[in-house]
Amino acid sequence: MKMIRAVVRPSKAEEVVDALAESGCVALTKMDVIGRGKQKGIKIDQIYYDELPKTMLMLVVEDDAAENVIELITKTAYTGSFGDGKIFVSPVDEAYTVRTRSCGL
């Protein structure tokens, strides 16, 4: 299994969530976060924003689905401008459902 953490623009988050749901990935966690990338913030007129609001989507998928999910997120969140986001992928050894105490997705 893979954990996918996608940090995207808040304005694109619902579009990404909807695209994931349409592809069958309905289980995810969505969080509002604040951060910055390589460009270290943004300056608009005389105001400098050190950190910018983003939305983080976290989901766990089977290994064979990870590449398609990453492609879907990348395609849907893309604007072509700085700040489109980042996707992090990590291995997941096990996942447990609290209610049923079952292991796996």
UniProtKB/Swiss-Prot annotation:
SMART domains per record: P-II
Keyword tags: Nitrogen fixation, Transcription, Transcription regulation
Molecular function, one GO term: enzyme regulator activity
Gene3D superfamilies: 3.30.70.120
Keyword Flavoprotein: no
BP GO annotations: nitrogen fixation; regulation of nitrogen utilization
This protein's GO CC annotations: cytosol
Transmembrane segments: none
Function per UniProt: Could be involved in the regulation of nitrogen fixation.
Family per similarity comment: Belongs to the P(II) protein family.
Protein known as: Nitrogen fixation nifHD region glnB-like protein 1
Organism: Methanococcus maripaludis (strain DSM 14266 / JCM 13030 / NBRC 101832 / S2 / LL)
Lineage: Archaea, Methanobacteriati, Methanobacteriota, Methanomada group, Methanococci
The encoding gene: glnBI
